[in-house]
């Protein structure tokens, strides 16, 4: 019998789920089993007959079709802190951290920040401790990004640095274990294990529940990996552990994966297909965050609730959210796309959509700001725009990734829209949400991009005048459609030159857009001290722009006559006096609440 067949048979018969990759420990056990099979096992005929009888008896005692139908409906999961049963080849105590210290480093997007909190929640329940001191760590985990080559090169360089740390490890301490988590583990699993023997574990974005097992296997001196992508993993029952005791905001993952299959993008291959969390679990997490108490850096003069004041809903394609967990909402209701937009896949039907979720989340706490990222322009039906306009605590800021201003390049990118459709959507959004702040993504030097295509992108930047932007040179990724069907034919120096031009134009136009705020009074959520001045405070306005203002005493509108100093988590009114492409400056007027601020802004 092949060793892998042995593992799979044990797996099925004992009822525990599929392993993404079989550890060397379990393979060794199976090899030992198969090498002794000729003397310890019955003849093949008797074995086959016994297996058939055993299968028949288990089938008769197994669940009925009615049981299957009942279990197929998604349960209302509660956030659980229980440790799952160990696989048969490990004892329960081998899965426990025994107070070993874990050091976590996060690279890349906001989803990775949230993934770090999920991974830490799982490890904490298994008995690990967290440290911010690299030197005292027993386990170092890097949560990685694979969106561009530069992001991966950063990790390779970091591993080279950690190799020296592992080599110098005193023998009196437990061996240092190093793990790669996230998208890079998913994309380059074999290369990482073969190239960097000092890497002990790999865990893809859908395998964080398996971290205790992987670390237990690594304790035997073997490399261990789980990079299986899931069709249903959302970590809905895992309450992420917020990593900062003084944080004013938090990320809440509402869905994972992406179905868009844009030709340049590696995300569908590193994070899998779209699947959404049940709304009930999202609301439970948001409620906990609104009640979560954090300690401000200085005692407030007026004590009150210090729950988190801002939540950002996260997803690779956040506004395509679709909760199909409740059967009564699974009727074939058509999906409304933005006008002039199409999809590259068969449009799904039914379920509770993003507008319903946004409505419910905004009702949890009227004093909590709600943001979301990263959306796709195709999924902005009127009901979403109307809700953003009506609710005071849903930020009037929309990220609208364009990627290019050329319809020809957009078609090659498989974005599902033309330049004209995109511009029409921009106008519609601004009409629906007066004063909305817009941000976008752009790629310079995509496959086949000509100078004329580049000029069209420049003109789009000038036409729209974004408040914020994220601009990058194109980086070819293996497995993508562009890698298989297009040619990366724009020279690197041309990509960089075009990128610099886009950045220059963006800054010019963003400065113009932001200067319209000068003289206006804006509501700012205080985050803390400015990084550049100990006498200034820093916060963000409704449009997610950074606002700097002096740390001075002010009035509290809810406590007339009381003078206070702002602290993280406070809402303050700031009169804007100057603006650049990235920052607003002003002077503080008073401390207020989100609901009361509408009378002043």
UniProtKB/Swiss-Prot annotation:
Methylthiotransferase that catalyzes the conversion of N6-(dimethylallyl)adenosine (i(6)A) to 2-methylthio-N6-(dimethylallyl)adenosine (ms(2)i(6)A) at position 37 (adjacent to the 3'-end of the anticodon) of four mitochondrial DNA-encoded tRNAs (Ser(UCN), Phe, Tyr and Trp). Essential for efficient and highly accurate protein translation by the ribosome. Specifically inhibits CDK5 activation by CDK5R1. Essential for efficient mitochondrial protein synthesis and respiratory chain; shows pathological consequences in mitochondrial disease. It comes from the Eukaryota. It comes from Homo sapiens (Human). Interacts with CDK5R1 (p35 form). CDK5RAP1, CDK5RAP2 and CDK5RAP3 show competitive binding to CDK5R1. Forms a complex with CDK5R1 and CDK5. It catalyses: N(6)-dimethylallyladenosine(37) in tRNA + (sulfur carrier)-SH + AH2 + 2 S-adenosyl-L-methionine = 2-methylsulfanyl-N(6)-dimethylallyladenosine(37) in tRNA + (sulfur carrier)-H + 5'-deoxyadenosine + L-methionine + A + S-adenosyl-L-homocysteine + 2 H(+). One of its GO terms (cellular component) is mitochondrial matrix. GO terms for biological process: brain development; mitochondrial tRNA modification; negative regulation of cell cycle; negative regulation of cyclin-dependent protein serine/threonine kinase activity; positive regulation of mitochondrial translation; positive regulation of translational fidelity; regulation of neuron differentiation; RNA modification. [4Fe-4S] cluster 2 binds at residues 258, 262, 265. GO terms for molecular function: 4 iron, 4 sulfur cluster binding; metal ion binding; N6-isopentenyladenosine methylthiotransferase activity; protein kinase binding. Its EC number is 2.8.4.3. InterPro entries: Elp3/MiaA/NifB-like_rSAM, Methylthiotransferase, Methylthiotransferase_CS, Methylthiotransferase_N, Methylthiotransferase_N_sf, MiaB_methiolase, rSAM, rSAM_horseshoe. Binds 2 [4Fe-4S] clusters. One cluster is coordinated with 3 cysteines and an exchangeable S-adenosyl-L-methionine. Residues 1-33 form a transit peptide. Signal peptide: none annotated. Residues 244-512 form the Radical SAM core domain. This is Mitochondrial tRNA methylthiotransferase CDK5RAP1. The lineage of its organism: Eukaryota, Metazoa, Chordata, Craniata, Vertebrata. Its cofactor is [4Fe-4S] cluster. Keywords: 4Fe-4S, Iron, Iron-sulfur, Metal-binding, Mitochondrion, S-adenosyl-L-methionine, Transferase, Transit peptide, tRNA processing. Expressed in heart, brain, placenta, lung, liver, skeletal muscle, kidney and pancreas. Expressed in neurons of central nervous tissue. The gene is CDK5RAP1. [4Fe-4S] cluster 1 binds at residues 109, 145, 183. Residues 100-220 form the MTTase N-terminal domain. It is found in: Mitochondrion. Residues 515-590 form the TRAM domain. PANTHER family: CDK5 REGULATORY SUBUNIT-ASSOCIATED PROTEIN 1 (PTHR43020), MITOCHONDRIAL TRNA METHYLTHIOTRANSFERASE CDK5RAP1 (PTHR43020:SF2). Belongs to the methylthiotransferase family. MiaB subfamily.
